[in-house]
């Protein structure tokens, strides 16, 4: 792979990562397809994906930085409004705990058995079905805003997040659907999902990066930097656009799109 082509690949995959990481469509499925079409796969591609995910994480921090600092009691001299900042670090810990425990226990097994195209294809379909269930059978909204979310609901979202350990299922799809099925509004469930993503993705990406450290070299820096920066910028735009769209749109189009991507995976890798 020439240097110019490597930078092109980094730019394209950065766009794909930034667009899909926080939408309920599975970034893994998209990265597998696009990486294959670009001829970029294998151990280095997996490490590259981990690095550019950090760009997407940084985008969440940039969008929700006041909330994130508020979790640890830092408000930059501003007094929180009535009812504001009741979302606490306890909510985040409860949301993280199930996936952290199960993820650490079966991390190696997941890497060995669930990263194939066929299993990702099934996960895309399963995640799409969950989105439809969440839209069609969700109960009446009991938690309208982020600050209305209870500890019980946070733990429930954490349990749903375990589904995202299955590559292709979509972490945001699992957590947002879980939140809606527990009576959280679509908007609040999405916001909680994004905030919860920061510690979860930092932990997961940090672990993967540590295990892949021998694959990194300074020669890869330009490619990784382009992918990281592109993912950050695109993810910023995607997050803000998504939060605006879900005020008036449901998740059925995302479910249908997942089925289309699953069919594409079938055509490219399975058929």
UniProtKB/Swiss-Prot annotation:
Cited function: Catalyzes the dephosphorylation of undecaprenyl diphosphate (UPP). Confers resistance to bacitracin.
Membrane topology summary: Multi-pass membrane protein
Keyword Transmembrane helix: yes
Entry's EC annotation: 3.6.1.27
Protein name: Undecaprenyl-diphosphatase
This protein's UniProt keywords: Antibiotic resistance, Cell inner membrane, Cell membrane, Cell shape, Cell wall biogenesis/degradation, Hydrolase, Membrane, Peptidoglycan synthesis, Transmembrane, Transmembrane helix
Main localization category: membrane
Pfam family, one: BacA
Domain of life from the UniProt record: Bacteria
InterPro entries: UppP (IPR003824)
Subcellular location: Cell inner membrane
One of the record's GO cellular component terms: plasma membrane
Other observations noted: Bacitracin is thought to be involved in the inhibition of peptidoglycan synthesis by sequestering undecaprenyl diphosphate, thereby reducing the pool of lipid carrier available.
Encoding gene (name): uppP
Family per similarity comment: Belongs to the UppP family.
